[in-house]
Amino acid sequence: MPRTSLLTLACALATGASAFSYGAAIPQSTQEKQFSQEFRDGYSILKHYGGNGPYSERVSYGIARDPPTGCEVDQVIMVKRHGERYPSPSAGKSIEEALAKVYSINTTEYKGDLAFLNDWTYYVPNECYYNAETTSGPYAGLLDAYNHGNDYKARYGHLWNGETVVPFFSSGYGRVIETARKFGEGFFGYNYSTNAALNIISESEVMGADSLTPTCDTDNDQTTCDNLTYQLPQFKVAAARLNSQNPGMNLTASDVYNLIVMASFELNARPFSNWINAFTQDEWVSFGYVEDLNYYYCAGPGDKNMAAVGAVYANASLTLLNQGPKEAGPLFFNFAHDTNITPILAALGVLIPNEDLPLDRVAFGNPYSIGNIVPMGGHLTIERLSCQATALSDKGTYVRLVLNEAVLPFNDCTSGPGYSCPLANYTSILNKNLPDYTTTCNVSASYPQYLSFWWNYNTTTELNYRSSPIACQEGDAMD
């Protein structure tokens, strides 16, 4: 036996590892690396867009996405943010004001980092596109939704027999409804028109707890959110650089922030954005952190009441998990907004920083990176696993959280197969820790006090398709 093979075998015996793992059959003389030593996810602008840019999968812990050996997914509960969209009308107004300053110098030739403006046009065709989901380019929102449905058909199609009518649920906002429809087309294919039943749940506060978008109108922890400045020193540096390259522009740090907001939306509608390179990597990192602050203090664990808001979904999904697929059903697909997913994560107690995020500097290494949590099309999937006994765990039922297609361990409850949590333990933890929504948010007694639509749903297909044109800047489709 060659010396190299003996050495491999000796090392394997000493460590208990297989001598032939990771492609040991590949000739030892090859110079090609089996694994790349370059990991550049941290440099991707998609991770510094905050919640504005195209979907990207969460950076994982290396836990296999497929079910652990000996386990089968028997129930899925998903909540998905709408797909990629154009800016909101309010953001559009600020963007147009910043662009007006850029164009005010009446130059025939922009220079430096803005030289591309000599050929560039704004990607929003007219004001009616504000709020709408995008339909053009490889990152288009409706394309994202359809592809996601198709991917989940491949992953979870075994949970549908091809004959029963499956209800799925959308909040009553225009782009959310369109996302749900495209996802449904991707998942059900030709059967979408007959075997899927879209249920649209109003976003009105009078829905109380029977909602995908519960509100907390008595929220008394919004002081930090209300006083966020959306500024870091790097924006002043960017303004000075762009002004020096194009005299007379007179951009401020606030203008730069609005231009970066504009840049962060462009890929939603186009395959390429020159605006990305108009700002440095440091400036993008700063922007991403400003977005982290916005979500943390305005719709996440930085607001002590958000866990109660998210508890509505967390508690109802816990009931589904304990009822199981035979009693409750196997598939629960839900569609809402980014700021409806972040409270759920707060309620579950995952991705909580050890201390509040500082406002005056970037907190590197904190777990609350919004580009990894709720990009456009972001989604939280709860899997119920039916598992056989292994050397490490008993036969039984387990729970896994999957955030943007990366397994997210449930805090210290990871004793199950694939670092899953035993359903009994998951239930005990949530029953102990979930706050009460109706009490915390002083929900009117005349409003619904719990989520019921997962059990009381329609099975008609009347809402599967639009019956009227999309309105200009359409928001709440149920107004």
Curated annotation (Swiss-Prot):
<dbReference type="GO" id="GO:0016158">
    <property type="term" value="F:3-phytase activity"/>
</dbReference>
<keyword id="KW-0378">Hydrolase</keyword>
<dbReference type="InterPro" id="IPR016274">
    <property type="entry name" value="Histidine_acid_Pase_euk"/>
</dbReference>
<feature type="glycosylation site" description="N-linked (GlcNAc...) asparagine">
    <location>
        <position position="458"/>
    </location>
</feature>
<feature type="glycosylation site" description="N-linked (GlcNAc...) asparagine">
    <location>
        <position position="227"/>
    </location>
</feature>
<dbReference type="InterPro" id="IPR033379">
    <property type="entry name" value="Acid_Pase_AS"/>
</dbReference>
<feature type="active site" description="Nucleophile">
    <location>
        <position position="82"/>
    </location>
</feature>
<feature type="glycosylation site" description="N-linked (GlcNAc...) asparagine">
    <location>
        <position position="106"/>
    </location>
</feature>
<feature type="glycosylation site" description="N-linked (GlcNAc...) asparagine">
    <location>
        <position position="425"/>
    </location>
</feature>
<feature type="glycosylation site" description="N-linked (GlcNAc...) asparagine">
    <location>
        <position position="191"/>
    </location>
</feature>
<feature type="glycosylation site" description="N-linked (GlcNAc...) asparagine">
    <location>
        <position position="442"/>
    </location>
</feature>
<dbReference type="InterPro" id="IPR000560">
    <property type="entry name" value="His_Pase_clade-2"/>
</dbReference>
<comment type="function">
    <text>Catalyzes the hydrolysis of inorganic orthophosphate from phytate.</text>
</comment>
<dbReference type="InterPro" id="IPR029033">
    <property type="entry name" value="His_PPase_superfam"/>
</dbReference>
<dbReference type="Pfam" id="PF00328">
    <property type="entry name" value="His_Phos_2"/>
</dbReference>
<protein>
    <recommendedName>
        <fullName>3-phytase B</fullName>
        <ecNumber>3.1.3.8</ecNumber>
    </recommendedName>
</protein>
<feature type="glycosylation site" description="N-linked (GlcNAc...) asparagine">
    <location>
        <position position="315"/>
    </location>
</feature>
<keyword id="KW-0325">Glycoprotein</keyword>
<feature type="glycosylation site" description="N-linked (GlcNAc...) asparagine">
    <location>
        <position position="250"/>
    </location>
</feature>
<dbReference type="GO" id="GO:0003993">
    <property type="term" value="F:acid phosphatase activity"/>
</dbReference>
<dbReference type="GO" id="GO:0009277">
    <property type="term" value="C:fungal-type cell wall"/>
</dbReference>
<feature type="signal peptide">
    <location>
        <begin position="1"/>
        <end position="19"/>
    </location>
</feature>
<comment type="similarity">
    <text>Belongs to the histidine acid phosphatase family.</text>
</comment>
<feature type="active site" description="Proton donor">
    <location>
        <position position="338"/>
    </location>
</feature>
<keyword id="KW-0732">Signal</keyword>
